[in-house]
């Protein structure tokens, strides 16, 4: 048995050497983390005692003051079937913003995702599909470059420029006020990052829940300190907004390519590139909470301001293998690729944070090995405590005073780490999750350890960290209630309802009336009636339809909707039902516009389809900036003069109304303005006193020649009341008298 004792003694002394080595490394790393803790708490206390005593905290209402600038959301999508629709639906119904477009990058060899995106684009005019040039999966950066190229093409065709470019994944749940925050800052800041707070699962889902622990501390303390000391903010890859200046600089720097296609963490890479160019970066923790409710708590010890932070929510991987894959990709990108791409700088402060980024390659191994050593030491301690005559193996540690001091210091630093983790997890998720984060420490260390091994293995296999391919991990998406179907073509609905034949549809498609969409064109050609068109449009959009008399709408109800809003969305308020405003429209209203309408009128809005021309004539009567002859008044006066019977006047009105068309419809149908971009221009037009046509010419969107041509087509398409009266048998003198009487009213 002597040999066994020798082996045990050798193991014991080897354990001591390993423990000493680990203790020294952990002490250095612990001091590093403790320094960040001290800076954070000193800065927080100082700001609370000085800044916030002199100045009130900024209210979220300030975010509403700037005009909505156009923002582009970039979403790379590889094998994201069934996710994009939910994201667009949730964004449309929850975002307190209207002037945004979503560009989804897909791949030619991913038809299922493309099909999903096509269906979403049919319902949401602000969602656009981008097909990458190369088959997937390429890198996320390559996909984003394709998306950015498509955005620049869209800007040229729509004749306007986006002010900000936002990174998101398809699984992200975007905070309702996120775009307003970006809109408020994007003119002054070049990189804006908001926190990421993962969704909770059941407490037994340890893998997924380790993400809430790490992000709570990272985005609650570490990144704010980094920004304060170094002025540099690493992008999280989601919830990041780049200014136009930043994107232009990146494109110029990369000769037309903004994102490094060989990088697995292009977001991390860009933060340094922009910093090198002297651009300003900011990490924003901005709560949306009423001052009166600031002290309210949803969970025990949960902070009201922290838990109402504008942030990105998403589910993170819930299985051990997917978490290891994802984190190994992060390690390759930040540690190995980052070390090769971003050399040490002349700034000691920035170098310090580069060191903190890269020490993970060591600390992840050290933390796990330290756990294993601690388990062995605890077993030895249990042995000595349970057996009175046990050998005192731990005496080899107690004999070194400096080692015991080092171990006690490390113990104190470890307790501090646990306390810090509990504090920051509790702030957002409540005390229960804060305490459970202690139990998840070992599991998180195991995941990080295995991710380190996998990252190291991949780098060694490829020989160059920049050759490792994008290993996309899948995420869950929160369930979204509501109908996410795509829109059926209008022609198909008319065929199914046996309103027209296939031959008539083919003829209508070949001989479409210039300036009109298919429905209006078939109405002009006499193939369908206004009622049949309204019924088909209502079926297409899943709403009801009805016929209205705009002149019978109470003026008190008209006052519910500002003229700029009614003209922008081409709607009329019809009635109130249980505090819900019912509005009429001649066409389907997309979910983004419907949500914007709800915000602008201050009450829930529902819409119905009405007969062709009834909204146009109603808008001209109630809201038009420059009123011409009132056609309804001319008919009324003709009846009063007994030049027409009431029956004749009614028939003339039924001929007149369906042949009235909006200028914007003709303009977009002719292709002079992208239909998905018209909303951006209409938002800007809300603040102008000019007619829409003159406004577009003044803004350089269209030429005067184009305006004249569109107005000419509008006049040719529309039927004038004067011509109908002459056709009904009135002479020119009678029509002139009616015009004169109309002007005098």
UniProtKB/Swiss-Prot annotation:
Which is one Gene Ontology cellular component term of this protein?
type II protein secretion system complex
> Which regions span the lipid bilayer?
8-28, 362-382, 393-413
This entry's Gene Ontology molecular function terms read: ATP hydrolysis activity; cyclic-di-GMP binding; glycosyltransferase activity
Q: Which UniProt keywords apply?
A: Cell inner membrane, Cell membrane, Membrane, Transmembrane, Transmembrane helix
Work out whether the entry's keyword set contains Acetylation. no
- Note the superkingdom of the native organism: Bacteria
Location in the cell reads: Cell inner membrane
Tell me a GO biological process for this protein.
protein secretion by the type II secretion system
Membrane topology (UniProt): Multi-pass membrane protein
* NCBIfam families per UniProt: PRK11234.1, PRK14716.1-3, PRK15489.1
The free-text function statement in the UniProt record for this protein reads: Required for bacteriophage N4 adsorption. May be a component of the phage receptor.
What is the protein named? Bacteriophage adsorption protein B
């Amino acid at each position: 048995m002597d040999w066994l004792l020798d082996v045990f003694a050798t193991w014991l002394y080897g354990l001591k050497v390993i423990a000493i080595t680990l203790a020294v490394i952990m002490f250095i790393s612990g001091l590093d983390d403790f320094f960040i803790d001290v800076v954070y708490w000193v800065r927080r206390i100082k700001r609370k005692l000085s800044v916030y005593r002199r100045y009130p905290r900024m209210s979220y209402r300030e975010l509403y003051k700037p005009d909505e600038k156009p923002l582009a959301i970039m979403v790379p999508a590889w094998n994201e079937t069934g996710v994009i629709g939910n994201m667009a639906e949730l964004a449309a119904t929850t975002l307190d913003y209207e002037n945004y477009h979503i560009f989804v990058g897909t791949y030619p060899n991913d038809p299922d995702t493309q099909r999903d995106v096509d269906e979403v684009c049919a319902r949401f005019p602000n969602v656009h599909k981008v097909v990458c040039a190369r088959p997937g999966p390429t890198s996320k950066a390559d996909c984003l470059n394709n998306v950015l190229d498509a955005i620049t093409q869209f800007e040229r065709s729509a004749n306007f420029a986006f002010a900000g470019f936002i990174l998101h994944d398809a699984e992200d749940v975007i905070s309702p006020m996120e775009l307003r925050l970006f809109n408020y800052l994007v003119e002054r800041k070049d990189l804006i990052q908001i926190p990421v707070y993962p969704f909770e699962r059941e407490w037994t889902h340890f893998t997924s829940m380790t993400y809430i622990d790490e992000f709570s501390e990272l985005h609650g303390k570490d990144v704010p300190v980094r920004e304060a000391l170094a002025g540099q903010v690493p992008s999280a890859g989601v919830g990041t907004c780049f200014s136009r200046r930043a994107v232009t600089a990146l494109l110029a720097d990369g000769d037309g390519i903004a994102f490094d296609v060989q990088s697995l963490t292009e977001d991390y890479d860009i933060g340094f590139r922009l910093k090198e160019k002297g651009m300003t970066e900011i990490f924003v923790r901005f709560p949306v909470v009423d001052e009166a409710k600031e002290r309210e708590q949803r969970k025990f010890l949960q902070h009201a301001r922290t838990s109402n932070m504008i942030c990105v929510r998403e589910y993170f991987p819930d299985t051990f293998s997917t978490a290891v894959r994802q984190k190994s990709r992060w390690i390759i990108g930040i540690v190995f690729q980052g070390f090769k791409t971003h050399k040490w700088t002349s700034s000691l402060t920035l170098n310090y944070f580069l060191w903190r980024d890269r020490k993970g390659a060591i600390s992840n191994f050290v933390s796990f090995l330290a756990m294993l050593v601690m388990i062995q030491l605890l077993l030895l301690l249990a042995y000595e405590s349970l057996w009175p005559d046990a050998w005192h193996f731990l005496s080899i540690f107690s004999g070194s005073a400096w080692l015991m001091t080092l171990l006690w210091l490390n113990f104190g630093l470890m307790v501090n780490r646990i306390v810090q983790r509990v504090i920051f997890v509790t702030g957002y998720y409540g005390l229960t999750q804060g305490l459970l984060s202690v139990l998840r420490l070992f599991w998180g260390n195991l995941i990080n350890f295995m991710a380190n091994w996998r990252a190291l293995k991949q780098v060694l296999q490829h020989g160059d960290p920049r050759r490792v391919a994008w290993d996309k991990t899948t995420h869950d998406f929160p369930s979204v209630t509501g109908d996410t179907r795509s829109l059926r073509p209008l022609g198909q609905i008319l065929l199914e309802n046996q309103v027209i034949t296939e031959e008539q549809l083919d003829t209508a498609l070949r001989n479409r009336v210039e300036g009109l969409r298919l429905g209006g064109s078939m109405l002009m050609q006499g193939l369908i009636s206004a009622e049949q068109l309204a019924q088909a449009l209502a079926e297409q959009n899943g709403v009801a339809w009805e016929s209205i008399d705009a002149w019978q709408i109470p003026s008190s109800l008209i006052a519910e909707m500002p003229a700029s809003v009614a003209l922008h969305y081409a709607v009329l308020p019809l009635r109130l039902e249980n505090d819900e405003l019912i509005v009429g429209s001649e066409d389907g209203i997309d979910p983004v516009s419907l949500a914007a309408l709800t915000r602008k009128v201050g009450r829930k809005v529902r819409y119905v389809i009405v007969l062709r021309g009834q909204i146009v004539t109603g808008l001209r009567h109630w809201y038009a900036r420059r009123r011409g002859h009132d056609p309804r008044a001319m008919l009324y006066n003709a009846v009063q003069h007994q030049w027409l019977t009431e029956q004749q006047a009614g028939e003339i009105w039924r001929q007149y109304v369906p042949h009235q068309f909006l200028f914007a419809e003709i303009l977009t149908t002719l292709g002079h303005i992208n239909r998905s971009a018209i909303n951006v221009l209409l938002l800007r037009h809300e603040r102008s006193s000019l007619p829409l046509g003159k406004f577009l010419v003044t803004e350089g969107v269209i030429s005067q020649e184009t305006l004249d041509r569109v107005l000419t087509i509008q006049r040719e398409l529309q039927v004038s009341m004067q011509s109908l009266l002459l056709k009904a048998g009135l002479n020119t003198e009678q029509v002139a008298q009616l015009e004169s009487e109309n002007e005098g009213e």
